[in-house]
Amino acid sequence: MLLGASLVGVLLFSKLVLKLPWTQVGFSLLFLYLGSGGWRFIRVFIKTIRRDIFGGLVLLKVKAKVRQCLQERRTVPILFASTVRRHPDKTALIFEGTDTHWTFRQLDEYSSSVANFLQARGLASGDVAAIFMENRNEFVGLWLGMAKLGVEAALINTNLRRDALLHCLTTSRARALVFGSEMASAICEVHASLDPSLSLFCSGSWEPGAVPPSTEHLDPLLKDAPKHLPSCPDKGFTDKLFYIYTSGTTGLPKAAIVVHSRYYRMAALVYYGFRMRPNDIVYDCLPLYHSAGNIVGIGQCLLHGMTVVIRKKFSASRFWDDCIKYNCTIVQYIGELCRYLLNQPPREAENQHQVRMALGNGLRQSIWTNFSSRFHIPQVAEFYGATECNCSLGNFDSQVGACGFNSRILSFVYPIRLVRVNEDTMELIRGPDGVCIPCQPGEPGQLVGRIIQKDPLRRFDGYLNQGANNKKIAKDVFKKGDQAYLTGDVLVMDELGYLYFRDRTGDTFRWKGENVSTTEVEGTLSRLLDMADVAVYGVEVPGTEGRAGMAAVASPTGNCDLERFAQVLEKELPLYARPIFLRLLPELHKTGTYKFQKTELRKEGFDPAIVKDPLFYLDAQKGRYVPLDQEAYSRIQAGEEKL
């Protein structure tokens, strides 16, 4: 009887709310009935129906708005224009560094000045312009102004230097580069290798001798530019907005394509799913060259009229003071930041704020409750997603440790799945029919999302590099003939459909809030070590988020000038990409296809009791690699050694 009532409830929801055809409803009910497992199904239904209905309604609302924007060819600048009309004099952005407040009208005028200036310099719809600067209000105004003209912004990671920076600038085919004065030295390092036709503009303090020749000071030029809205470009909702550089799965940073619909979808799902309000004030200390800071954070300002406080960089000691000063109600985080805050000594300010929600990803289950209780934050809004992925998740009901959920009852509504993979090679495991095998509750698997290019919520826009796209797409995943996006991440689903992040697979790992490409680091280290075989991988360190980089180097003699090596690394790699641990061994074992076998290396880690090869770690205070003995290992395990 209860099972019948449950099926009737599903029937009504599927037909009246989701408006699915009768055939699909019928087959779904039959499948649910046959696979329900009796009381187990009833238990899952009772515990999750409220969550699933809310999630379904959020998805329907966003789908309806996306469909409307698609039909009316609305773009982010057009949507922002309607926000300006609603709140012209409301504060849009606050830059903490200078306490600069911009209203929506001021942001609109600044971005229009950018569009008119670039148009006068010959840039047109479809061209690319790069932005290379630290967080501040102008960062938002620059890419928004470019979007008003139809120019696609390439948002460059400010940690990149030399080869990686040059790679991003050249592959983007940018016609212009706007860099902050704080980035001048990095631009000078690659200037000789840049295309001579690339127009250079510097924003911020002006020192002619500190910038490359032919560089122009942008700020006074924008003041003289017209502030009216330029003619609208022929852009639609699924056209390119900007590029965010990500390490992807292999090699140098790749330009992930962000179209207008993707920007809207990511911001809207967070807004409606976590019940945000137009009068919320967001504290955004995440990099604006990443999707979390620029889409999830800034998107609430541009699309929903919220005020966003921008900080140049995260500061654990100033975090709560800033929240109090600006009356912030929502704070953004990555898991590492939460740990830094917990490591701070208790102080009055941490309980005098008005923060009601912490929004982000990567908060470990082990510190989740401690974080929310110590700082009195009622809602932890954890989500999962990547710039280019089509299978974002949201933990809408604050289930401790979960990064999201998918309905066990109506799983077909949101076509994502965990599929079995080979633990050593991370290759997809397929059944006799050639289709990927779905994981059961409690079984780790790679998260995949079905690709439907005609659906803005299911499409995969990918990268500028087509070769990179091919590595992220698999065929015959849900059924024969389909395509799915491969996240490269291992998750686990429990009986109720909650999903928990387990590991980052493939050729990347996450450290200090950044994705580290092992292939890129391996190439750099090998070049510095006279082309020696080098395998780079991530290892777990107690008390830290993500995985610390470790490099196994083939050194038959065991000799290596580690002091010089550390000095050169400072110039070659950003801080988060430098290996924390080194292992010198006679040779590296390879597969038949000449790939390094990293599984055993990862398992052995950096424990000198297990690893008999010479081990070293990067001493943060000395700035060089020192021997890793049992005493140092114990300090690291106890969290007494700063990494």
Curated annotation (Swiss-Prot):
The answer to whether the entry has keyword Endoplasmic reticulum is: yes
UniProt-listed Pfam families: AMP-binding, AMP-binding_C
Q: Which SUPFAM superfamilies match?
A: Acetyl-CoA synthetase-like (SSF56801)
Where does tissue-level expression of this protein occur?
Answer: Expressed at highest levels in brain, testis, colon and kidney. Expressed at medium levels in heart and liver, small intestine and stomach. Expressed at low levels in peripheral leukocytes, bone marrow, skeletal muscle and aorta. Expressed in adipose tissue. Expressed in brain gray matter.
UniProt family annotation: Belongs to the ATP-dependent AMP-binding enzyme family.
The membrane topology term of the UniProt record is: Multi-pass membrane protein
Q: Name the Enzyme Commission number(s) assigned to this protein.
A: 6.2.1.15, 6.2.1.3, 6.2.1.-
Recorded coiled-coil stretches: none
Q: Which UniProt keywords apply?
A: Disease variant, Endoplasmic reticulum, Fatty acid metabolism, Ichthyosis, Ligase, Lipid metabolism, Lipid transport, Membrane, Nucleotide-binding, Transmembrane, Transmembrane helix, Transport
Catalysed reactions, as listed in the record: a fatty acid(in) = a fatty acid(out); (9Z,12Z)-octadecadienoate(out) = (9Z,12Z)-octadecadienoate(in); (9Z)-octadecenoate(out) = (9Z)-octadecenoate(in); hexadecanoate(out) = hexadecanoate(in)
Locate the transmembrane regions by residue number. 20-42, 139-156
Top-level taxon of origin: Eukaryota
Q: What does this protein do?
A: Mediates the levels of long-chain fatty acids (LCFA) in the cell by facilitating their transport across cell membranes. Appears to be the principal fatty acid transporter in small intestinal enterocytes. Also functions as an acyl-CoA ligase catalyzing the ATP-dependent formation of fatty acyl-CoA using LCFA and very-long-chain fatty acids (VLCFA) as substrates, which prevents fatty acid efflux from cells and might drive more fatty acid uptake. Plays a role in the formation of the epidermal barrier. Required for fat absorption in early embryogenesis.
Q: What is its main location?
A: endoplasmic reticulum
InterPro entries recorded: AMP-bd_C, AMP-bd_C_sf, AMP-binding_CS, AMP-dep_synth/lig_dom, ANL_N_sf, Lipocalin_CS
Q: Which GO cellular component term is one of those annotated? A: plasma membrane
Disease per record: Ichthyosis prematurity syndrome: A keratinization disorder characterized by complications in the second trimester of pregnancy resulting from polyhydramnion, with premature birth of a child with thick caseous desquamating epidermis, respiratory complications and transient eosinophilia. After recovery during the first months of life, the symptoms are relatively benign and the patients suffer from a lifelong non-scaly ichthyosis with atopic manifestations.
From which source organism is this entry? Homo sapiens
The Gene Ontology biological process annotation of the record reads:
establishment of localization in cell; fatty acid metabolic process; fatty acid transport; glucose import in response to insulin stimulus; lipid transport across blood-brain barrier; long-chain fatty acid import into cell; long-chain fatty acid metabolic process; long-chain fatty acid transport
Question: Does this entry carry the keyword Transmembrane helix?
Answer: yes
Q: What else is known?
A: SLC27A4/FATP4-mediated fatty acid uptake is associated to paramaters related to insulin resistance, which is associated with disturbed fatty acid metabolism and homeostasis, such as obesity. SLC27A4/FATP4 expression is positively correlated with acquired obesity.
Which protein are we looking at?
Long-chain fatty acid transport protein 4
Q: Which is an annotated GO molecular function term of this record?
A: oleoyl-CoA ligase activity
Compartments, as annotated in UniProt = Endoplasmic reticulum membrane
Q: What CDD domains does the entry give?
A: hsFATP4_like
Which parts of the sequence bind AMP? Answer: Y243, I244, Y245, T246, S247, G248, T249, T250, G251, L252, P253, K254
